[in-house]
Amino acid sequence: MSDIEARVKKIIAEQLGVEEAQVTSEKAFVADLGADSLDTVELVMALEDEFGIEIPDEDAEKITTVQNAIDYANTHKKA
């Protein structure tokens, strides 16, 4: 597991109040991890803070799974 993947999974577990072991790449935030719309907004904000990035609304709407979040962080992270 890469450092970014581990950081993303830790943030998701903390934000959604689930065990980190439940946070696997194929899981969807809403369907599998019980997130609601406010949770997903807070999750995007936490990812922005952690990786020093800004996630536009149109991109945020596409981040619906753990793997989407990992891929986005890998692609857009600041050095």
Curated annotation (Swiss-Prot):
Pathway: Lipid metabolism; fatty acid biosynthesis. It comes from Albidiferax ferrireducens (strain ATCC BAA-621 / DSM 15236 / T118). Keywords: Cytoplasm, Fatty acid biosynthesis, Fatty acid metabolism, Lipid biosynthesis, Lipid metabolism, Phosphopantetheine, Phosphoprotein. One of its GO terms (cellular component) is membrane. PANTHER family: ACYL CARRIER PROTEIN, CARRIER DOMAIN-CONTAINING PROTEIN. The gene is acpP. The modification O-(pantetheine 4'-phosphoryl)serine is found at residue 37. 4'-phosphopantetheine is transferred from CoA to a specific serine of apo-ACP by AcpS. This modification is essential for activity because fatty acids are bound in thioester linkage to the sulfhydryl of the prosthetic group. It is found in: Cytoplasm. HAMAP family: Acyl_carrier. The keyword Transferase does not apply. Belongs to the acyl carrier protein (ACP) family. This is Acyl carrier protein. It comes from the Bacteria. Residues 2-77 form the Carrier domain. Disulfide bonds: none annotated. GO terms for molecular function: acyl binding; acyl carrier activity; phosphopantetheine binding. Carrier of the growing fatty acid chain in fatty acid biosynthesis. Pfam families: PP-binding (PF00550).
